[in-house]
């Protein structure tokens, strides 16, 4: 570890193989918490390179419990987390709107590491019992178009760094890795990132991996489209900065997207959105993220049509019915 840290301090890059072996050693318990914290800190300060990130991804995928949903060509909708904004569960809400619109969603998530309520927290609040049983998950995909995979059941290696991540309370390379290690290797991905350098990083990674993608960033630092400012979208086909008004949305205020002080409060907001009882700012924020997820799967559709599809899923009750069926199947 000392030699690796020295190289990183000198701004040297690791090869894909070196990065893979480094993370495999961490998952095998070969380093203590102080060493892991030092490693996470130096990567946060100097930044991670494309080949390093792919190497880390390969390490975690080596140790994962795989599951095959390739027949469904699903999408995962996720943010890197760690943006410090403590928003409600926007990506997870968007998943149910997309599934309600008839698409297949394979959501991979975890408990909140730097926020009150991560995806696993809000899903668990509904009485869902996490599983890695392929038969149960396939039934959920078949009957409601939505699967939730709790990261710790599929990526047991992540447990070894959980306490360090919680103690640091800042974004780390594991926030960057989380969206890349969905155990079913989804065909599509909507990924929210907190800054423009991350957009470039992930765009390069997704292009090398051959994944259909949309990477989004609100220019005021949210790791999702928050509508609190202009936002940028990068896909296989285009790179554009949008103003919310260009797509028929109002500008939101940061406090309108607050996720609450407890998982219970976050769950209430989540339910309000899918019951179509939320505030306009909360609803619009979820709809716009769901819309770009739909376009990631159907790139020929203009974004205005994707917004209409997402809105119909919510306002018709299809998104809520998807949630109810999902809870019934997974409780």
UniProtKB/Swiss-Prot annotation:
A GO molecular function annotation here is:
anthranilate phosphoribosyltransferase activity
The family annotation for this protein states:
Belongs to the anthranilate phosphoribosyltransferase family.
Which reactions are catalysed by this chain?
Answer: N-(5-phospho-beta-D-ribosyl)anthranilate + diphosphate = 5-phospho-alpha-D-ribose 1-diphosphate + anthranilate
Give coiled-coil spans as residue ranges.
none
Positions binding 5-phospho-alpha-D-ribose 1-diphosphate in this chain are: 79, 82-83, 87, 89-92, 107-115, 119
Gene3D superfamilies, alphabetically?
Nucleoside phosphorylase/phosphoribosyltransferase catalytic domain, Transferase, Pyrimidine Nucleoside Phosphorylase, Chain C
* Cofactor(s) this protein cannot do without: Mg(2+)
Record text on cofactor binding: Binds 2 magnesium ions per monomer.
Pathway field = Amino-acid biosynthesis; L-tryptophan biosynthesis; L-tryptophan from chorismate: step 2/5
Question: What is the role of this chain?
Answer: Catalyzes the transfer of the phosphoribosyl group of 5-phosphorylribose-1-pyrophosphate (PRPP) to anthranilate to yield N-(5'-phosphoribosyl)-anthranilate (PRA).
Keyword terms of this UniProt record? Amino-acid biosynthesis, Aromatic amino acid biosynthesis, Glycosyltransferase, Magnesium, Metal-binding, Transferase, Tryptophan biosynthesis
**InterPro entries the record matches:** Anthranilate_Pribosyl_Tfrase, Glycosyl_Trfase_fam3, Glycosyl_Trfase_fam3_N_dom, Glycosyl_Trfase_fam3_N_dom_sf, Nuc_phospho_transferase
Q: Which residues bind anthranilate 1?
A: 79, 110
**Keyword match NADP:** no
The reply on keyword Transmembrane helix is no
- What is the main EC category here? transferase
Protein's name in the database: Anthranilate phosphoribosyltransferase
Annotated Mg(2+) 2 binding lies at 223-224
Entry binding sites for anthranilate 2:
165
For this protein, what is the EC number?
2.4.2.18
The positions annotated for binding Mg(2+) 1 are 91, 224
Its quaternary organisation is:
Homodimer.
């Amino acid at each position: 570890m000392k030699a690796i840290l020295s190289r990183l301090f000198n701004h040297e890059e690791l090869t894909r193989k070196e990065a893979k072996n480094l993370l495999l050693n961490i998952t095998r318990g070969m380093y203590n918490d102080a060493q892991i914290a030092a490693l996470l800190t130096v990567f946060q300060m100097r930044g991670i390179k494309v080949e390093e990130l792919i190497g880390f991804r390969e390490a975690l995928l080596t140790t994962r419990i795989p599951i095959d949903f390739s027949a469904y060509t699903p999408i995962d909708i996720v943010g890197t987390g760690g943006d410090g904004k403590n928003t409600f569960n926007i990506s997870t809400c968007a998943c149910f709107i997309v599934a309600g619109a008839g698409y297949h969603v394979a959501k991979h998530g975890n408990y909140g590491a730097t926020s009150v309520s991560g995806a696993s927290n809000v899903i668990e609040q509904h009485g869902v019992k996490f599983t890695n049983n392929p038969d149960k998950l396939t039934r959920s995909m078949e009957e409601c178009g939505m699967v939730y995979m709790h990261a710790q059941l599929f990526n047991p290696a992540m447990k070894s760094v959980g306490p360090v991540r919680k103690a640091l309370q800042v974004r780390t390379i594991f926030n960057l890795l989380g969206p890349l290690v969905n155990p079913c290797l989804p065909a599509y991905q909507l990924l929210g990132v907190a800054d423009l350098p991350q957009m470039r990083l992930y765009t390069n990674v997704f292009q090398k991996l051959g994944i259909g993608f949309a990477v989004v960033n609100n220019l005021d630092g949210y790791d999702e489209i928050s509508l609190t400012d202009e936002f940028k979208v990068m896909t296989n086909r285009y790179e554009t900065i949008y103003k919310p008004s260009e797509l028929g949305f109002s500008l939101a205020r940061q406090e309108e997207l607050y996720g609450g002080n407890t998982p219970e409060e976050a769950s209430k907001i989540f339910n309000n959105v899918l019951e179509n009882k939320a505030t306009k700012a909360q609803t619009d924020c979820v709809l716009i993220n769901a819309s770009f997820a739909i376009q990631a799967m159907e790139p020929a559709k203009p974004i205005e049509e994707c917004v209409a599809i997402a809105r119909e899923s919510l306002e018709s009750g299809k998104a809520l019915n998807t949630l109810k069926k999902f809870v019934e199947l997974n409780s």
